[in-house]
Amino acid sequence: MRFSKRPSVDAQAVEDASGAVLYARDLNAQGRKGMIFGPLDMDLAPRQLAVIHGPAGAGKSALLLALCGRFRRTRGTLIIDGIDAMAEPYRAIQRTSVARIGDYVVPEDRLTLNESVAERCHLDAVNLKKAESRVRQIEEIVG
């Protein structure tokens, strides 16, 4: 998702997604070498399970990151728990979590350690001063 050029909230898509925890329409991503995944339409209801499978290099990891609102090249419509993830990516990722997927989910190079801590605190509604204090304690323990 491009955070610099956010589209306006798609009110019709949010209404269409009513009751779904995940709603995707024409979700896709392209890279320098072509299509990474998609286009994909998907509705996921509460307590429903979705399985993503395919051969290595098919775009599964990118798709899973996109479905959590964490893949910047994503295009299309993505509603996560009533939030338009294309228009409000930071609100959407507060509702999602990603387990470690190889080296894909790592701290962003553009952020310092302090900025990474501040971003996580903002997303998790944790008091920044308390978190900074905890980081200092950890630094003292680990050296």
Per-region residue spans from a language model:
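Q-loop/switch helix immediately C-terminal to the Walker
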Residues: R95, G102, D109-V126, R134-Q137
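Conserved ABC transporter NBD signature motif
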Residues: G76-D84
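Helix-to-loop junction immediately C-terminal to a conserved catalytic motif
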Residues: C68
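Conserved beta-strand
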Residues: A24-L27, M35-A45, G76
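Conserved N-terminal strand/loop that marks the beginning of ABC ATPase nucleotide-binding domains
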Residues: D16-Q30
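ABC ATPase NBD coupling module
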Residues: D84-A99
